[in-house]
Amino acid sequence: MLNTLQANGELNATHIDQMARQIADFHLQAPRVPMEHPLGTPDSVMAPVEQNFEQIRPFLSDKVDLQQLDALQAWARSSFERLQGCWKSARPMASSVSATVTFTWQRHLDRWQGSDFRLHRVQRAFPTDRRLRRHGLPGHGPGRPWLKCLARRFISQYLELTGDYEGLELLNFYKAYRALVRAKVALFSMPADADGVQRATTLRTYRNYANLAESYSAIPSRLLAITHGVSAVGKSHVAMRLVEALGAVRVRSDVERKRLFGEQQQADAGQLSTGIYDQDASAATYLRLHEIAATVLRAGFPVVLDATYLKREQRQAAAEVASQTGVPFLILDCHAPEAVIASWLEQRQAENSDPSDATLEVIKAQQASREALDAQELVHSTRVDTQAAGSMDQVIEQIRQRLPGL
């Protein structure tokens, strides 16, 4: 089981990717319920949130704890009002979810079998399904940074599979709600005749979860990064490093292109400028990338756009999104020796699991037609030698120094 893998330090990216696909497939196939359903109203979203505060408050006597709870309640109410448009436009899905395995990222992985959860509001499946609200709670504490990396990877992979980037605006609201549910459960578990030691232990657990909820109400640090380089140079790996290390959301051009236009026809296979890769399709794909980037940034998350960005006008359009949203802009200028690119391409084609259709001929054409970064772009760029293990470590450290909140 997953909790055993986690306890043994064996839980890895493959497990997370598989879980993301299983849950994404479930949500995409789940039946929908009508908007007029009693559980489909905004008020039904807020009722259990308010209930948390009402049930927690009688257990607290410390002034600092009470002040924190009041601040969290005020934030929850203001967030609920700010997100009114999201509640009304979100697509409702199944109102009952049978969960056989669910994650929690605070301290460990919990396994729930045969549990039938009645959802208070089944909005966009991503933030409101109870399983995913648990997924959103990253591992904190010494010796567990890899759990946070895996939680971030799950979020990005799930979004990539479903395309439900608009649901991100609801994520921190629900993460805070779920953290306070865990805080409440800790208080409920305290015996009525608890001694001083038991009460102190319970309050310590409560405060850990309350602090976790508070962290989700903080003003976020955001960033818009784009990759720049030919196919098979390692851009997707570079982008995923930003996901795991900084909590960015990766948006892949290959995925969004096919979400828009479907698969390339066999007759056009290997062609650089026909079918779903013609000029109009490429322009629409980059436009969609930039729309998603704006959505992710509005939700308070950093974003990395995983595309070739070989043309200057494409990069300028991305820079404009960063300017309009008031966030730093970074170009990850990806390089690798030609022999390395060729070997990675061969491996990718053999595995047949990547959405890219690029061939060696396509890559050579890209190398010949790419527009080099100009002087102004170089100011916002950093070189990444993708074959060098430590290159991205340096980039991530530079970003953290510039944006300590990440």
Can you say where each PLM-predicted feature lies in the sequence?
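ATP-dependent phospho-/nucleotidyl transfer catalytic cores
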Residues: 2-105, 109-223
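Conserved phosphate-donor/acceptor-positioning beta-strand/loop module used by diverse small-molecule
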Residues: 325-345
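Conserved substrate/cofactor phosphate-moiety recognition/catalytic segment
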Residues: 243-301, 343
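The conserved Walker
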Residues: 231
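Hydrophobic anchor at the beta1->P-loop junction of P-loop NTPases
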Residues: 227
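Hydrophobic positions on the alpha1 helix immediately C-terminal to the Walker A/P-loop
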Residues: 238
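Conserved lysine of the Walker
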Residues: 235
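Small-molecule kinase domains that catalyze NTP-dependent phosphoryl transfer to phosphate-bearing small molecules
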Residues: 347-396, 406
